[in-house]
Amino acid sequence: DTGSTSTGGAGSSGTQGLDSGPLETTSTGGLPGTSGGSSGAASTSGEPAAVCGDGVVEGDEECDDPGDTRCFECVRDRLVFVTSEDVQGDFWTWSPQNLDYLCNHLAAVAGLITDNKFRFKTWISTSEESAAERVFHSRGRYVLRNGLVFAESWDALMAQQILNPLNVDENSQTRNTAVFTDTRPDGTAMPGSHCDDWQSDSFDTLVYWGLSAATDANWTLYVGDATNPVSCDIASALYCFESP
């Protein structure tokens, strides 16, 4: 039963979706890749090194609570999910001009967000920004809604060390489906118009997709089907990554 265990969410529990007012975005403090980390390293300031497990968050620790199921080796787990809803290639035009709206709306409805802030990024590439530039490069684990680990870290993800398929939606339900990505396994953008940067659902524009059931590079770019890419009028799911 994929819904029996939940890892919690980006906020406390709740049932409302994002409201119609302005939405705040959270900042990663610069380029992705600066997350979390190792505890116990010597301090350069002469202060005692952080000790993971002492209950005190210090140094490069993101968390330090033995009772927190989302804290692993003093680095916070990041939730990932595949959307329960499908979109066509023009989803940017109906989602308040924000590529991340659907991820955050569904997360809010599922109780993963209650503070009206965008806490998830869509794994999608555009002509100006690749998926790797969009999502947070965590030193910690990317975890599914059922508690299973998708990848141990950003580095593991880039090495295609996929432990479990990213086939669980925001409601903890299994969903094996095609997913729009336009993204290579290394996170860079595939060539093409990206459905005119996600503003076209025309049959004569194309988009590359991944397979949520895959546990290898096919998760983001499925190569086992001659119909990849497909036309942008096809409906497909999206991947969502908690950031930061």
Give each language-model segment a name.
Residues 48-76:
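Extracellular calcium-associated, cysteine-rich motifs in secreted modular proteins
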Residues 1-53, 63:
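Ser/Thr-rich, Pro/Gly/Ala-heavy low-complexity intrinsically disordered linkers and tails
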